Amino acid sequence: MKLETEIVNEKQKVLIVSKKSYQFLDYLKKCLKKYSVDVFVSPNNPGNLHIFDYCFFINEVPPLAQLKKSATFFIFFFINKKHLSLSLFKNLKKYKAIKINNENLNHNEVDRILWFIFSQTQEKVLKIDTVSPQLKKNVTLTPFRLKIKKLSTKKNLIILGFSLILLLHFLFIPFLITSSFFTYLSFQALKKEQVESSQSNLDKANKLYLLTKKLYSFSRPTLLFFNLALLPDSFIDIDLSSQQLVNQGIVLLKNGKEIQKIIFQKNKTDEEILELKLRFVKLHQGLKTISDQSLFLAQKINFPLTFFKKFNQQLLDYSDLTGKADKFISYFELVFSAKEPKKYLILFANNMELRPGGGFIGSFGILTTNYFTLDDLKIYDVYDADGQLTAHIAPPKPIEKYLQLPHWFLRDSNFSPDFLEDYNKALFFLDKEMGMTNFSGGMIITTSAIENILSVFGNLYLPDYKEYINDKNFYLKTQLYVEKNFFPGSIQKKVFLSSLIDQIFIKAENISLAKLGLAIKKSLDEKQIVVYLNDDKIQSLIDSSYWSGRVIEPNCSSPQKNCLIDYLFPYDANVGANKANLFINRFFNLKTTVDSQGNINHLFSLSYINSSPGETFPTGYYRNYLQLLLPLNSKIKSITKDGVLVEDSDQKDNLYKTIGFYFEVPPKKTVEIKISYQLGEKLTGDKLYQLIVQKQIGASNSDLVLQFSLAKNVTLTNHNFSPIVKDSEIVYNTSLSTDKIFLMELNKYE
C-alpha cells in the first residue's frame, strides 16, 4: 500500500475592528493577504479574540480583562487622539500601538506601520505625522524650498535615505571605540594602583558603553540578518567584561588596603577581628572572580594583531597570578588565625656566602603571632646563641676539613640541601644554646629575598644611622655597619637589622600590598625564602607549591605511565669564609646520549666565573665544596676540572647517590667542571622519561642547557617543554630559577 504525505499550511487569522471605513484599510488588507493571511473585518468587538493571531483595533480599546486572558497579539491604532495615555497597556506583553495625527495615510506610511508591527524591535509605540491634502494645496514654496524640491528627486532621496540608514546602523562604532579606550585607561591606572583615576575613567567608559548598547539595539537585527553581528557582539561583550574586571580590581584593591591597616594594629577589638575575617572572605571571592574573568576575556580576545596578543598574555598572567595569590593568602590566613600565641623561627642567611641550605646564618629572629596579630619580631645575632654552646657537636667533614672548625654551631647548621633537615638541626642548636623550644614553624630568608622585599618599600630612612636604605644599597650598607670591625658578641648587627625591621613595620601600612605579594612570591618561587610549618594541613599546601625547600623524592609524576626516573641536584658550599658568591656566575649544561641499546649516558658541565676584583675580603678566591645528588643506580665514569681528572672525591649512597669534591676558582678566572656518569636503568620500549633538576636554596638563577642525542631506533613522541629539534638532536635553553621537571615520551625499537 502506497502512503502519501500531505502537507497542510495553516493560515494565520487577522481581525480588524473599526467602526469607520478608513481609506487606508483597503491597502492594509491587501498587504496582509499577500502573506497568506485570512483577514476578517468587523465594526464591533466579536468577543472571541483568542481564535485570532493578530487583532487590529482602530480608535477602540476592548476591556483590559479580555485582553489579559488572550494570547493574541494586539495592535491599536489611535487617530487624532492627542491626549491618550498608554499606561493602561503596561501589563500587556504582546501589543503595539500606532499614533496617527491624520487618517489620510499613504502607501509608504502603511508599509512603515506593517514593518513596525512585524519586526523584532522592542519599541511598543510608533508615531506617524501626516499632512492633510488641503494644507498641501495652500503651501507657497519659497525660493529655498523650490531649490530643495529640485534636489529632492527620487534618485537623490533614495541615495540620501540609504546613506542615513547606513549611518544609523554603524553609529555605535565610534562610541564603542571610545568606551574601550577609557576602559583601557582605567585598567592601566589600576595597575599603578591609582584608584581615583581608574574609577573616573571607568565611569566614563560605562556611560559610553550604555549609549553604545542603545545605538546597537537598532543595528543588531539588520546585522544579524546579514550574519554580520558576531564581531560587534564580541567587541561589546569584551568591553563589558573588561569594565567588570577593572571594577572588581578596584573593589579588591580598596578591600586589601583596609586589611593592610587592620593587620598591623595591636590589641584588636572583637569587632576589628570580625571585620578582618569578613574582609578576607571578600578578598578570596574577589580574587576568584578576577581569575575567572581574566581567563574568560583571554579566550574572547583571540585576534591575530600584536596588541591583542600582548593583552591576551597579560590576562592569562593575571588569571594565573590571582589564583596563586588566593592560595598564598590562604596560607597567611591559616597561620595567623590561630587563637593561641604562636612562635616562628626566622633564619637570616647571607647567600653571598652560599651554603647547601641557603647561606651563612648571621642572624635569626623570633616572630610571635596571636590571633590575626603580628605581636613581635625580635632579632638575635647568631653569636648570641653560639657563644652559649658548651657541648661539643661534631661538624660535617667538609666544615671540619675546609673551614678548619672542630665544633659545629647554629651559624653553620644548614649544611643539608633539604630545609626540613636544616630546620630541625637549627632547633637542636637553639635548644642546646639558649633553651628555646616550642616553635610552630620556621623559614629561611636570604639576602636576595630581603632585597626583593625592600624594592617595594623604596627608600627607608634609619634615624640612628642617618642613612637611606633600599634594595640597591642594602648589602653594601650591611657590610659597612655589620661586618666592619665585627667580633663575636658585638651587637652592631642586631641593632642595625632591628632598626631596619622597625622602619619596615612603620611603612608597611602604606606600601602596595600587591607589589609586596609579588616580591614575596618571587622569593618563594626562586627558593630565596623556604618555609616549614608544624601544621600538616598548611604544610601540605606549601609543599604543593614547592615552597618548602625539600629534596624531591624519586617518584614518577604519572603513575599510569611506564616511567624512567632521572634526577640532578648540584649545590655549593662556600668554605672560603668570604662573600665571593656576590661575584660568581654559574652556567650548567647537561648532555644526554641514548644509544641503540637503551643506555643513558650524561655529561654534566658546570662553568664557574669569578669576577671578584681581587683577593681582599669580602671578595677573593671561591673555595667551593660542590656536591651533586644523582639517581642511586648511577655509575660515575669521571670527574674533571679544566680537563684534569679529580681524584679526591667523596661518595655515599642513601636515597640518592651523593658526589662531593673541593675546588677553587681564583679571582677573574673561569673553571669548568665535568661529571660523566651513566644511569643504571636502560630505556626499553615505550617509556616516560622524567628528569628533575633542582635548584639550591639561596643560589642565584643559572643558565641551563639541555642537549639530548637519540639513537636512530629511539624516537621522541611527546614532551612538556619547547626544545629545538633537528633529526635526533634536541636542544633546550632555560634558566634554573626554580625546581624544574622535564618529561619526554620515548620509544625504543628493537
Give residue spans per PLM region.
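Non-catalytic, solvent-exposed segments at the cell envelope interface
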Residues: 2-11, 18-26, 30-36, 43-52, ...
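Alpha-helical transmembrane segments and their juxtamembrane interface "caps"
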Residues: 13-15, 37, 165-167
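Solvent-exposed, conformationally flexible loop/turn segments
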Residues: 597, 666-670, 686, 725-744
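Juxtamembrane membrane-insertion context
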Residues: 139-143, 733, 738-740, 750
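Hydrophobic membrane-insertion alpha-helices, especially the h-region
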Residues: 156-174
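A surface/secretory-pathway sequence property marking extracellular, secreted
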Residues: 634-653, 715-741
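Secretory-pathway-linked proteins and extracytosolic
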Residues: 46-49, 740-750
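Charge-rich, low-complexity terminal tails
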Residues: 476, 710-713, 721-723, 749-750
